[in-house]
Amino acid sequence: MNFNIIDWTYNPYDHTGYIFILHKMEYVLDLAYFFIKTRDEGIKEIIFDILNSWYLSCNDKLDNPWIFHDHATALRAFNISKFLNIMKNYISEDQFLLLQKILAIDVNKLLMDEFYSKNTNHGLDQSLSLYKASFFLEVDNILDIRNVAIERINSELKFAFCDDGGHKENSPAYLYYGVSQVLRALDIGYKYEKENTKIYFPLDLLKKSCLVLGYFVQFNEKMPLIGDTVEFKINNFL
């Protein structure tokens, strides 16, 4: 396959889900895990053909709403950071530099106030991705980037929940996702900075939110179909 002719803006299905999956790049992690298991250099070659094609095609399209969707950009930065972590012992200097270039593009985009989806679940994911990326991107102002991320994370967490534990986006699904985001934020802060983490959420409020979520769960372990909630079971929540 000739990756050099891929049009990363092409959406043959005219479907937002397709283009979202294409640009969040979770499949790159799947390929990385497959490479680590098999040590098949052909798999790694495919990975970097994909990444190089994306970089050459997209680095000058910073205003394209498909490539730089507010949520897809956040998840791509998160996935590239994770890729750097799990593949650090298997990549060349040139491959490392390519990943740094891609991550820098996404980080710079996420830093822009006009791109930041403030006070939304997307904004929190953007901030969490910015925080994670600050441990893998090698630039001089990395501490400034991390501090911006921490400030945004704490602001998003404070805004998202009411005093009674409810979620302001106001559906069972968003409460579930919101509590999941809180736990992920606390976990990622401890993972990278241990007791020095500055990411904060009041424990009493978290307990209230978990209690509210518990009252939402029906006898069949599913959430009521209120608002934009779709049918799903809560599994391994904590």
PLM features: residue spans?
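Surface-exposed beta-strand-to-loop junctions
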Residues: 6-8, 25
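Hydrophobic alpha-helical membrane-insertion signals
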Residues: 1-5
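Acidic/polar loop patches that form or flank catalytic/metal-binding clefts of enzymes
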Residues: 198-199, 221-227
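Aromatic (Trp/Tyr) and acidic
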Residues: 232-238
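Short, surface-exposed recognition loops and adjoining beta-strand edges that mediate ligand/DNA contacts
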Residues: 203, 207, 225-232
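Alpha-helical scaffold segments of alpha-solenoid architecture
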Residues: 211, 217, 222-223, 234
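Active-site flanking loop/helix segments enriched in acidic
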Residues: 10-12
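Aromatic-lined, polymer-binding surfaces characteristic
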Residues: 15-217
